[in-house]
Regions:
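Sec-dependent N-terminal signal peptides
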Residues: 4-15
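Short Pro-Gly-centered beta-turn/loop motif in secreted/extracellular proteins
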Residues: 66-74
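Short, acidic Ser/Thr/Gly-rich low-complexity loop/linker segments typical of extracellular
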Residues: 53-63
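A short, solvent-exposed loop/turn motif at the edges and junctions
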Residues: 77-90
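Extended beta-strand-rich segments in extracellular/periplasmic secretory proteins, especially
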Residues: 223-274, 278-286, 320-321, 326
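Hydrophobic beta-strand segments
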Residues: 39, 45-49, 62, 78, ...
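Surface-exposed, low-complexity/disordered segments
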Residues: 89, 99-234, 246-249, 298-299, ...
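Structural motif
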Residues: 24-42
Length: 422
């Protein structure tokens, strides 16, 4: 009998609550965001129903949907924004009846910025980063906030085979910024699937994904894993051309670990609002290339006869301003690695990904009991139900799946329904 080994992996940085509804009825709009100059789909575009905290993001194909209360007026405004582009505002009535096959095409226009180079150089990049971090309490909520979020995680083998896929609506008690309190997270409802077969000799299990996605909140956690007073000892900074997000100008600072450091740190970019000095976005990658010891950061348990090499580890976290404060809005983590059994010439390539979109928030946080909290040691697969219901999400906003993922979900639902009828 062929033995199947197990690999347990976590996406670490080095080491919604679901509102009760009196009625399930909702209305829905669909759109596709593209670059107005090139026609290419735009990932991570932010879509918000003005005057509310209801929001979502576009997927890799630019597609999004947004659910809202049926009593919302048809002339209510929807804003669509993306870093480096002018924000566009539409009416709900502009979208027409919901049609996922023919969504409204929304073209965002790139915004170029011409600044005096001397003005850019006037901002010392290291001082700019420190100024932004020192202003965390002024720019982010300093009290508990309740949030609703959609979360998705998956493990993929090669380019097409999804080994596991889990999705959930989360209840979140977001802890105050500038405090040492931890965010509390609970699963309101979720679904998942595993797709291993007799050809798979390695089970890749993803532990702590929900907790880890909150640990990359760079406005709350130590910046790139180092304390405030150590930043300039570990990192070097460089000013980059500024960008616009709608009508907001953002300073851009790139960073990388200093040469000669033995430990693995990060490189990336920080986007800082020019008026408030709030951190609006962070894009970063762990410097794992060519480092055999990178596996020790991510792998919790692995078979002794298997070599593990981390190829890349990428992170994105985005914030959005609401009434003078900036809120955790979207985050994504993705690690790519390859494995090879001892004395084997063949390699297997894997991708582990998780992403979260905050779809609503309010001042009163949910009560999440200790026994219901998601903990780092938890595996989402063990906490969610199967993909049996095509209308599983009801009136909750979710990140629309890319076409390849959507096809997988449809297939899973069909297979499970067929199995239940047998």
């Amino acid at each position: 009998m062929k033995r199947t080994a197990t690999l347990l992996i976590a996406l670490l940085l080095a080491l919604p609550f679901a509102l009760a509804q009196e009625s399930p009825d909702y209305l829905q709009i669909a759109g596709k965001v593209i670059d107005g100059a090139t026609g290419k789909p735009m990932h991570y575009a932010s879509i918000t129903l003005a005057g509310t905290n209801i929001s979502n993001v576009s997927n890799a194909e630019g597609f999004f949907s947004l659910k809202y209360h049926p009593k919302t007026l048809p002339d209510a405004l929807v804003t669509v924004s993306h870093l480096g582009y002018a924000t566009i505002t539409l009416k709900l009535s502009d979208f027409g009846p919901y049609d996922s096959e023919h969504p409204l095409t929304i073209r965002l226009i790139p915004v170029s910025i011409n600044l005096d180079p001397a003005l850019i150089r006037a901002h010392d990049p290291a001082e700019l980063i420190l100024a932004a971090l020192y202003r965390i309490k002024q720019n982010y909520p300093t009290k508990h906030i309740g949030m609703t979020a959609f979360y998705r995680e998956m493990v993929k083998k090669g380019n097409t085979k999804y080994l596991t896929m889990n999705e959930a609506i989360l209840d979140i008690d977001k802890a105050p910024y500038g405090s040492y309190q931890n965010d509390r997270i609970g699963i309101y409802k979720g679904r998942g699937s595993q797709n291993y077969d007799s050809t798979d000799t390695l089970f890749v299990k993803y532990q702590g994904g929900v907790v880890s996605i909150f640990q990359i909140d760079q406005a709350k956690e130590p910046f790139a894993t180092v304390s405030l007073n150590e930043i300039t000892h570990f990192y070097e900074f460089k000013s980059e051309p500024s960008e616009f997000n709608g009508d907001r100008m953002l300073y851009v600072v790139s960073f990388n670990q200093k040469p000669g450091l033995d430990e693995i740190y990060f490189r990336g970019k920080v986007f800082i609002d020019s008026e408030s000095l709030a951190i609006g976005r962070v894009e970063m990658a762990m410097n794992v290339e060519g480092r055999e010891d990178a596996a020790d950061i991510f792998v919790i348990k692995r078979p002794n006869d298997t070599r593990f090499e981390v190829k890349s580890a990428d992170y994105v976290v985005n914030y959005k301003p609401v009434d003078g404060k900036w809120y955790y809005d979207y985050a994504k983590m993705e690690i790519k690695f390859e494995t090879r059994k001892r004395r084997s010439l063949f390699k297997n390539h894997f991708t582990v990904m998780s992403e979260i979109a905050i779809t609503d928030h309010q001042e009163n946080p949910p009560k999440i009991d200790s026994d219901a909290r998601v903990k780092f040691r938890d595996q989402m697969t063990e906490k969610v139900s199967a993909f049996t219901d095509g209308n599983f999400w009801e009136n909750y906003n979710v990140i629309e799946p890319d076409a390849s993922i959507e096809a997988i979900i449809r297939r899973i639902v069909r297979q499970l329904k067929k199995h239940n009828l047998e």
